[in-house]
Regions:
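Sec/Tat signal peptide C-region and signal peptidase I cleavage site
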Residues: 14-18
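A short, hydrophobic C-terminal helix/tail in secreted or cell-surface proteins
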Residues: 158-176
Length: 181
């Protein structure tokens, strides 16, 4: 086996397209997510997983802004899609919901919309990107926002990519063994 063959095998393995996992399972099981409050007392309910999760924003009475985040790491490059069903007690301007991508917040709720909103959101990730969901509270007063996220799908590595990398590793180990003997 030559260096060129190894390079071609590695290139083929790394250029494989991603598969898609549907629901909060496998690489996107709730155990692989991180929950964070910053000046907020929100919470996440994963009892509906893998079909859905629910995120509830802060209302700690501080009068200051805060965030409730639920984030994970992209297992492969591809598209993340999810449906969301949102409600708030004090108006969407005060408690917007959206998604995070590498720390940047993209709001999906409409500040001028009703206290009940829903939709579908889609964005692209690269392997290793941090992404997730956020409820931002401007004031931590007058009630919380809640969102249920369902029909979640996200990219995972193709099984053939993993298999190719394992084969490549085995070939490399075999060559090293043969070279010694």
């Amino acid at each position: 086996m030559t260096v060129t063959t190894v390079s071609l095998t590695l290139a083929a393995a790394s250029s494989s397209s991603a598969a898609t996992v549907f629901g909060f399972q496998d690489a996107y099981d709730p155990i692989n997510w991180t929950f964070t409050n910053s000046n907020a007392d929100g919470f996440v309910n994963t009892g509906g997983a893998p079909a859905s999760i629910s995120l509830t924003g802060g209302n700690n009475g501080s009068g200051g802004s805060g965030t409730t985040d639920y984030t994970t790491t992209a297992a492969a490059a591809g598209t993340v899609t999810f449906d969301w069903n949102y409600s708030t007690a004090d108006g969407p301007f005060w408690d917007p919901f959206g998604y995070l991508l590498n720390g940047s917040f993209t709001q999906v709720t409409n500040n001028g919309g009703g206290v009940f909103q829903n939709g579908t959101s889609t964005f692209n990730v690269l392997a290793g990107d941090s992404f997730g969901f956020r409820i931002f509270t401007r004031d931590n007063l007058f009630g919380r926002a809640r969102v249920t996220i369902s029909n979640f799908s996200a990219p995972i590595p193709e099984p053939s990519t993993v298999l190719s990398l394992l084969v490549l590793g085995g070939l490399g180990a075999g060559l090293k063994y043969l070279k010694r003997n």
